[in-house]
């Protein structure tokens, strides 16, 4: 997990970690975690912080060491990336920016990707993703489709 981080990112995280490790003992408290993450441009909710701590704080002592912190940050960044990638992909399909992907928009993008689909195939793709049955795909439906694999 942490091998996906660049040396620069690791150095950045180490610096931030050290700033909040007041007594220099190599651990930060759960309370300090939110402050550290916000200083790195993340914006976790209280529930997310608690979940992250529970995931990495193996002995349940309320403190996190640097390797645990790195694992957690790598995980958090991965989630953010994939969410952003899905949003970007949706924008590519949603040509007119109305928040929906129509059959025509889907056909246009698939054709540009070199996929020659029949109208039936395009309609079938829309039907599979179209949870509320309105004949087009909204962002929530698109996310569900992209993350269901």
Swiss-Prot record:
One of its GO terms (cellular component) is myosin II complex. The modification N6,N6,N6-trimethyllysine is found at residue 116. The modification N-acetylthreonine is found at residue 2. Ca(2+) 3 binds at residues 94, 96, 98, 105. Ca(2+) 4 binds at residues 130, 132, 134, 136, 141. Pfam families: EF-hand_7. Ca(2+) 2 binds at residues 57, 59, 61, 63, 68. InterPro entries: CALM/Myosin/TropC-like, EF-hand-dom_pair, EF_Hand_1_Ca_BS, EF_hand_dom. PROSITE patterns: EF_HAND_1, EF_HAND_2. Ca(2+) 1 binds at residues 21, 23, 25, 27, 32. The keyword Calcium applies. Keywords: Acetylation, Calcium, Metal-binding, Methylation, Repeat. GO terms for molecular function: calcium ion binding. PANTHER family: CALMODULIN LIKE 3, MYOSIN LIGHT CHAIN 1, 3. Calmodulin mediates the control of a large number of enzymes, ion channels and other proteins by Ca(2+). Among the enzymes to be stimulated by the calmodulin-Ca(2+) complex are a number of protein kinases and phosphatases. This protein has four functional calcium-binding sites. Belongs to the calmodulin family. This is Calmodulin. It comes from Halichondria okadai (Marine sponge). The lineage of its organism: Eukaryota, Metazoa, Porifera, Demospongiae, Heteroscleromorpha.
